[in-house]
């Protein structure tokens, strides 16, 4: 993480260093959501081969998504904290089969200018207490 937003995810850890998979890599996938009160749009953000942009995929057709929306990590997978800035939607369109929405995203962090990053370690998703009757608190 840099002050501009998410740069990538730790891919491999060694004794003295860690290898980071950049967010712009086609191999990188992060749970994401729209940061707008009237939108419940969620999807998966990741890199596009040969481009410096991101693609937000797997968004329900009915979800509210528009150009200019701010995209943040969703935190739903439990592998990343929620609400880390990813980027901004520059265009929306339907997927190749016309069933789901997709969005082009410009990354918030200028990865070409990154010199130092903050690595979040020891992240543990909030535990839920299961009450009698199966409801989580």
Task: Give the positions of each predicted feature.
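A secondary-structure micro-motif
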Residues: 1-137
């Amino acid at each position: 993480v840099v002050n501009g937003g998410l740069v990538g995810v730790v891919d491999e850890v060694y004794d003295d260093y860690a290898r980071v998979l950049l967010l712009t890599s086609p191999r990188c996938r992060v749970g994401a959501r729209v940061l707008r009160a009237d939108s419940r749009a969620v999807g998966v953000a990741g890199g596009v081969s040969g481009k410096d942009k991101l693609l937000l995929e797997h968004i329900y057709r009915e979800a509210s998504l528009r150009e200019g929306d701010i995209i943040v990590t969703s935190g739903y997978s439990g592998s990343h904290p929620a609400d880390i800035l990813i980027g901004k939607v520059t265009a929306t369109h339907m997927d190749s089969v016309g069933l789901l929405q997709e969005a082009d995203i410009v990354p918030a962090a200028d990865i070409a200018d990154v010199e130092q990053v903050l690595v979040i370690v020891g992240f543990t998703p909030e535990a839920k207490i299961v009450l009698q009757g199966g409801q989580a608190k």
